[in-house]
From Swiss-Prot:
Name of protein: S-adenosylmethionine synthase
Disulfide bonds: none
PROSITE patterns: ADOMET_SYNTHASE_1 (PS00376), ADOMET_SYNTHASE_2 (PS00377)
A GO biological-process term: S-adenosylmethionine biosynthetic process
Gene: metK
Keyword Transit peptide found: no
Catalytic activity: L-methionine + ATP + H2O = S-adenosyl-L-methionine + phosphate + diphosphate
NCBIfam families: metK
Pfam families: S-AdoMet_synt_C (PF02773), S-AdoMet_synt_M (PF02772), S-AdoMet_synt_N (PF00438)
Transmembrane spans: none
Record keyword Nucleotide-binding present: yes
Length: 388
């Protein structure tokens, strides 16, 4: 029997969090390659610590990339531009250790096979207009508003920050927000009182639906009392360490593979995007109110070795019909995914902060619901509706 009354918590981090800085630099490298060479192969990792950035990986491309310039431009855009923030785009060292992709991998990928083995998941539900779980969507809303407020002139804020939102569910539906945690890097001179007032008024009040907040909602702002040292000075940043923030906030499984810094021949990324595309269209079609899709691949093999659809008991037709409809409507080879979602465009740096899913920008092609009618027809839902 599924749990019906519970609290579920998800977290998000800002673009100035050190791990997200690493993700954005890795994806900035990927975008730079794709602008010049759409067939380039990229597996780029970034590490940041006080005063330096290290870019490493396997990149095979005709493109000419100025890695130090690219890294500094990304850090500058994020907002680290002076030493008092703990990191300065203008003075940081940039180390580069980049080699080419192994020809052993390339021989399988070049013929259309998957770039690695592994399993990937996609998830969707009807809790929010974006068909995302409510906790992660609200957590992202808070961190996005933190960055927006900082850029709009709330100069007591610094780029590093995190949010955590606990949502209360009754009968399996989100009904209220129980707890909001916001931890934000700040100027040393600001008082706790001023910071708390600013975050409540300029961030939380603008980011979260008023109907879900009540007098019992707990709001915790910088619970340790101080957050001056942040960014790479406070914590080492590494690509691929925020994979739950990147996806569904823990509501929905994860295959373990990170996204950022990987070109779409890597199914860790492209098949996870396709999984989201499928799950979202299943829910949008009215076939289920929750849907999780798993696909799995073998390295060098084009077709997935398995496809699974789980609707958690919410399906309007037998799950077997939905699974067959998925195979009928969607191409699941790496080449079909890349072509179907138009993944050879330089659109990835935007994905590297505030979630890869649940976004409304047109460049996020895996968020379209343009297959819902075809899915409903293939699964026989339109016939059921006609009879009813």
């Amino acid at each position: 029997m599924p749990l019906q009354d519970f609290l579920f918590t998800s977290e998000s981090v800002t673009e100035g969090h050190p791990d997200k800085m690493a993700d954005q630099i890795s994806d900035a490298v990927l975008d730079a390659v794709l602008r010049q060479d759409p067939k380039g192969r990229v597996a780029c990792e970034t590490l940041l610590k006080t005063g330096y950035v290290m870019i490493a990986g396997e990149i095979t491309t005709k493109a000419r990339i100025d890695y130090p310039k690219l890294a500094r431009e990304t850090v500058r855009r994020i907002g680290y531009t002076s030493g008092d923030m703990g990191f300065d785009a203008n003075t940081c060292a940039v180390l580069v250790a980049v080699d080419q992709q192994s020809p052993d991998i390339g021989q399988g990928v070049d013929t259309g096979g998957a770039g690695d083995q592994g399993m990937m998941f996609g998830y969707a539900c009807d809790e929010t207009p974006e068909l995302m779980p409510a906790p992660i969507q609200y957590a992202h809303a808070v961190t996005k508003q933190l960055a927006k407020a900082r850029r709009a002139g709330l100069d007591l804020l610094r780029p590093d920050g995190k949010s955590q939102v606990s949502v209360e569910y009754r009968d399996g539906r989100p009904v209220r927000i129980d707890t909001v945690v916001v931890s934000t890097q700040h100027a040393e001179s600001v008082s706790n009182k001023r910071l708390h007032e600013a975050v409540r008024e300029q961030v939380i009040a603008k980011a979260l639906p008023k109907r879900l907040l009540d007098r019992k909602t707990r709001i915790l702002i910088n619970p340790t009392g101080r957050f001056v040292i942040g960014g790479p000075m406070g914590d080492t940043g590494v690509t691929g360490r925020k994979i739950i923030v990147d996806t569904y906030g823990g509501m929905g499984r994860h295959g373990g593979g990170a996204f950022s810094g990987k070109d779409p021949s890597k199914v860790d990324r492209s098949a996870a995007y396709m999984g989201r595309y499928i799950a979202k269209n299943v829910v949008a079609a009215g076939l289920a109110s929750r849907c999780e899709v798993q696909v799995a691949y073998a390295i060098g093999v084009a077709e997935p070795v398995s496809v699974m659809v789980d609707t958690f008991g919410t399906a309007k037709v037998p799950e077997g019909k939905i699974a067959r409809a998925v195979r009928e409507v969607f191409g699941l080879t790496p080449r079909a995914i890349i072509e179907g979602l138009d993944l050879l465009r330089p659109v990835y740096e935007k994905t590297a902060a505030y979630g890869h899913f649940g976004r409304t920008e047109k460049t996020f092609t895996w968020e379209r619901t343009d297959k819902k009618e075809a899915l409903a027809d293939a699964a026989g839902l339109s016939k059921i509706r006609a009879v009813i």
